[in-house]
């Protein structure tokens, strides 16, 4: 009999498989699609154009995982984005921000000398606060109802870092626990800087910058430290699927078996214990532990409510899986131009990182959210444009480019019929917004792939199209994720575990959920839980 069956071949499940197999456990990964990675994939949608179709940047990837699994020697190459963001401005120089502090301050100073003076202190608070949280990312969450000695080490490291905050602690708490608007406006006065920073608070969240709790989402996305530089995110050479392939290589080398085109349709239960899975082709497999890399709602559906403890099932059903996200993938025949680069023949600094378009003020970001909340499509959505082939030319034919548009806010409860009428129409609106600051952009598009929330759910198996496997609100973090009492990757059904982004520490391509879950599962199977 197998020791472990992992449902889904997403990056967290692949990470868990590698650790479990390295521990000597007989492990198999079952992925329903023909390629591995879940939402962390590269797809050649059009000849010569390699697209990171869902997840599109790295930066939260845990350094311990990279080192322990030897991902760099397995071909993983992270390409830091320097600068990291560009906000075009038709009436000004635009705003380039990145790890070069002097260059960033010079850009900010165009809009506000006061903001340029305060920005280094803001960065310092973010860095110090991140040092408090980081030890907690790499360990199962502390459960106050059932404390363990093993919880003490990460808590003590976090406490030591917290003491280091000293006079910054009030500012850090205000940023992390409040709304993005309250946090950002207490620091800065210039609208380009305010709105640029606020977008990180909204990624994947059905919220506007004024929504309480968005400060944590902002902070979550600022914890990236590619190459040891805080806030620096990276592209993966070859697309995001190259990361998943490196993880799969580590798992296979350790002895794990990985199958694609192997869709799990049911989790089997015998004598009150999860012990098997059934595949779409009728194959049945048994194991001592069934580990789901799917989101909690999808896991419950595979289990069947009749086999789930009632309180746990009710908690999972109450989770918020709404998604305001549309993903548009493009093939371009040439580089886009912007006010700062009216003649873009070669990639410049403006093309390296995230380009902020569409809603350009805090008020417009709130208006975009309000439209989606009413079930409508916003006139000026939030648009984040990235051009990974400007940094990684292996992704497109010579002289051509791939682009990714991460778009919010779309109505999260809109049905398939709504999207049949509005999917392409809204994509046209998005391109028209880009044309305002990048003349002729829409005319450069050779191909496009438009994914509304129902499409993201259908293709990638994410309930509601939610990229985080459930909202990252303050009441769904740490010992409360996915639900109170069941945050340490186990479920109340013996033999069934979770390892996806619906568990601590949450969404983003970091691999921590899989790594942490593997530690818990190994101990459980060896009788050391």
Report residues per predicted region.
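Structural core of flavin- and non-heme-iron oxidoreductases
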Residues: 1-35, 39-40, 108, 114, ...
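Extreme N-terminal leader/targeting segments of oxidoreductases
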Residues: 1-4, 22-23, 477-479, 483-484, ...
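N-terminal glycine-rich phosphate/pyrophosphate-binding loop and immediately adjacent elements
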Residues: 2-145, 472, 516
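Active-site/ligand-binding neighborhood in enzyme catalytic cores
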Residues: 127-254, 462-477
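A glycine-rich dinucleotide-binding beta-alpha-beta segment and adjacent secondary-structure elements
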Residues: 190, 194-210, 375-388, 440-504
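Mid-domain catalytic core of redox enzymes
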Residues: 235-237, 256, 263-396
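A conserved FAD-binding loop/helix module that cradles the flavin
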Residues: 501-522
């Amino acid at each position: 009999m197998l020791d472990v069956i992992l449902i889904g071949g997403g990056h967290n499940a692949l990470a868990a498989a590698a650790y479990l197999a390295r521990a000597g456990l007989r492990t198999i990964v079952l992925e329903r699609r023909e390629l591995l990675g879940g939402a962390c994939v590269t797809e050649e949608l059009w000849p010569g154009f390699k697209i990171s179709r869902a997840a599109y940047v790295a930066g939260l990837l845990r350094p311990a995982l990279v080192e322990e699994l030897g991902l760099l020697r397995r071909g993983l190459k992270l390409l830091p984005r320097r600068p990291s963001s560009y906000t075009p401005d038709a009436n000004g120089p635009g705003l380039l921000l990145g790890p070069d502090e002097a260059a960033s301050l010079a850009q900010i100073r165009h809009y506000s000398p006061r903001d340029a003076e305060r920005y280094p202190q803001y960065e310092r608070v973010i860095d110090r606060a991140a040092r408090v949280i980081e030890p907690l990312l790499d360990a199962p969450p502390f459960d106050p109802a059932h404390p363990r000695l093993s919880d003490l080490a990460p808590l003590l490291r976090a406490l030591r870092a917290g003491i280091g905050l000293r006079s910054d602690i009030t500012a850090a708490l205000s940023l992390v626990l409040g709304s993005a608007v309250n946090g950002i406006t207490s620091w800065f006065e210039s609208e380009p800087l305010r709105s640029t920073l606020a977008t990180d608070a909204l990624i994947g969240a059905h919220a506007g910058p004024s929504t309480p709790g968005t400060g944590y989402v902002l902070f979550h996305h600022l914890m990236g430290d590619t190459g040891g530089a805080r806030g620096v995110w990276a592209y993966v050479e070859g697309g995001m699927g190259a990361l998943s392939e490196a993880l799969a290589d580590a798992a296979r080398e350790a002895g794990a078996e990985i199958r694609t085109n192997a869709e799990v349709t049911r989790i089997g239960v015998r004598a009150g214990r999860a012990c098997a899975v059934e595949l779409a082709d009728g194959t049945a497999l048994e194991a001592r532990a069934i580990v789901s890399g799917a989101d909690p709602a999808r896991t419950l559906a595979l289990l069947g409510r009749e086999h789930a403890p009632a309180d746990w099932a009710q908690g999972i059903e109450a989770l918020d899986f709404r998604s305001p996200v549309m993903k548009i993938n493009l093939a371009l025949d040439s580089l886009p131009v912007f006010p700062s680069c009216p003649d873009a023949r070669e990639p410049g600094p403006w093309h390296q990182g995230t380009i902020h378009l569409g809603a350009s003020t805090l008020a417009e970001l709130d208006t975009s959210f309000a439209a989606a909340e009413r079930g409508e499509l916003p006139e000026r959505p939030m648009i984040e444009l990235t051009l990974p082939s400007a940094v990684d030319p292996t992704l497109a034919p010579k002289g051509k480019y791939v682009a990714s548009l991460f778009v919010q806010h779309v109505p999260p409860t809109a049905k398939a019929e709504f999207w049949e009428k509005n999917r392409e129409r809204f994509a046209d609106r998005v391109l028209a917004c880009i044309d305002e600051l990048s003349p002729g952009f829409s005319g450069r598009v050779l191909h496009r792939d438009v994914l509304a929330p129902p499409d993201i759910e259908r293709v990638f198996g994410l309930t509601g199209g939610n990229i985080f496997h459930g909202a990252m609100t303050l009441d769904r973090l740490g010992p409360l994720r996915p639900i109170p009492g069941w945050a340490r990757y186990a479920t109340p059904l013996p033999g069934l575990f979770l390892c996806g982004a619906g568990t601590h520490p949450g969404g983003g391509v970091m691999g921590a959920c899989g790594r942490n879950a593997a530690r818990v599962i190994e101990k459980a199977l060896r009788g050391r839980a």
